[in-house]
């Protein structure tokens, strides 16, 4: 549930999809790129970088920007969905939204945060 998304976000996401000749759009917000510095512990106990083995040792300023789905918008061409059986296609576009409209309500704390942000407008 994304109550702070508005109709302009949806319209703009469709427009971006058509302009880019994309097959899908997922709304996102920028996310702290330090996630790229994390490791996964394999079943044998050895570590590997979550994305690759270079990022954990790079300066954060040199890491690529990262984006987290915010749950507000998922648009996909029905033919692509049937062919790939996934919301993610090879031509999925990110529709970046500001953090103040990227509250996804999954629990009571999220609801309280959304209410505060809504009332602040």
Where do the model's predicted regions map?
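Short histidine/acidic/glycine/proline-rich micro-motifs that form metal-
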Residues: 1-4, 101-102
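Conserved core of the sugar-phosphate nucleotidyltransferase
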Residues: 3-91
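Hydrophobic helical membrane-anchoring modules
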Residues: 83, 94-96, 100-121
